[in-house]
Amino acid sequence: MYDRTLVLDILRQIDGALRKIRDRSHQITNAEELTASPEGEERLDGLCMLFIAIGESLKNLDKITGGTLFAAHPEIDWKGAMGFRDVIAHRYFDIDAEQVWWICTHEVEPLSEAIHRMIVELGA
């Protein structure tokens, strides 16, 4: 068995990062807004930093729980979420703003919902 308190703490950190992503990306209407100005590039940088933190935390959760936590939630592409962190961290100059924007608009909300379900299931 794993340390439930530690897992809940990490889940809450991920939840906070996802909330920041939603807050910082909800007014973006297309990927060009992330590259067309210095402000957009700063927003892209900030979003990528949050995705790195989320991906790293997901990797830690997977290790701590021996894969059992994510196995109970197959509706999320956990491997893809963790892998996106690797792309951002190791191939930063190859980041595709279109991909970041697509993830913000299509993947963040389902991930957030899954994280909330996990928090509830663990009794927080």
Predicted regions and their residues:
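Solvent-exposed interaction patches of small proteins and small membrane subunits
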Residues: 1-124
